[in-house]
Structures are given as structure tokens and as C-alpha cells.
């Protein structure tokens, strides 16, 4: 009799330990049902993601989310849950446009950055590899100066003629109509275009 009671006690303790070790996910908490290892939404909406699940449930519904998770491959289910969460949260922020509004905003930013790339003047460099900007009045051409006085070149409005003269570099080179020629010295140097978009600078190799 005592042995039977001890066995029942051990079984009860094992059951309680298993139930306490598996915390109910956000989906099962919302539905107020017991969560077990077979819950399909448990790995993707744990208890700490209650806010995210509430948004997903409001937009898509629990049964629809379960169907979508079952229809995709297991390795893609995390991406699916992240996508549903992102769409649902943006639907809460913008009930009219939802995630499409964020997509439009990103497209407008991309157009702005591309226009800055095409319209920003070329940036010069000196022998100390310091990048600087010279805002000239040339409409179609470029202008590059050298702050240290060791050399520089400029381009006319047509973007064709080059006037380059090096004072301290050991030689002088001048080419008016030949285009981009004789612009290499004994040591290789790189020229970068710097795009200032108001937040940070991007250095683009020419």
C-alpha cells in the first residue's frame, strides 16, 4: 500500500514538473488552453512575444496563422512568423496603408539617395589622402583642388577638357583636350566620391 502511494506521488510530481517546464506560448495563453510540445505556434510565438501575437491574431486570426505555418517548410516558418508580425505591427501603426506605407517610404528614400549620387560633385584628395569637397559653379563639369598646394586639376563645363598641373610632385603635366590622361603618379592613389545624405557619408569608388 505504501509502495503504491509512493509510485502515485512520483508520477504526479513528474507530471507537474513537465507542465511547469513547458511554459504556455502566447497563442495558447490567448486561447486559454494548455500548451504542449505539439503546439505548432509555440516555437515562433513564445510567451515573451504576447504583444506581437496579439497584433498577428487581430489581423490574420489564429486559425489562419496555424494553416499558413503548416503549409510552409519547417525551415521557412521562422521567416513566415517574422513577416506576419511585421505586417501586423505596421497595420496597427498605419490602419490605412499598413506595410505598404513603409514600402513606399523606403522607395522614396532610395530615389533620394540615387539622386544625390548623380548630383553630388566629385570629391578631391591631396597627397595626405585627405578627402575634401569643392562646390564649384560648373554645371556639367567637375572641380578638384588641393588644399596642401601640391597639385590638383579641374574640368570645364563640358566635362571634357582637363587642366592638371602638379607643382611639388616632381613634374608638371597639362592636357587640355585629351580627356582623363596622365593622371597617374609613381604611387597609386584612389579617388572617392562622397555622398552626404544628411545622416552619414558613403564613399563610393570611382
UniProtKB/Swiss-Prot annotation:
Instruction: Output the PROSITE patterns linked to this UniProt entry.
Output: LOB
Q: What InterPro entries does the database record attribute to this sequence? A: LOB (IPR004883)
Pfam families registered for this protein in UniProt: LOB (PF03195)
The record places domain LOB at 23-123
At the top level, the lineage of the source is Eukaryota
Region Disordered, residue ranges? 1-20
Q: According to its UniProt record, which protein family does this protein belong to?
A: Belongs to the LOB domain-containing protein family.
The name this protein carries in UniProt is LOB domain-containing protein 2
Lineage of the native species? Answer: Eukaryota, Viridiplantae, Streptophyta, Embryophyta, Tracheophyta
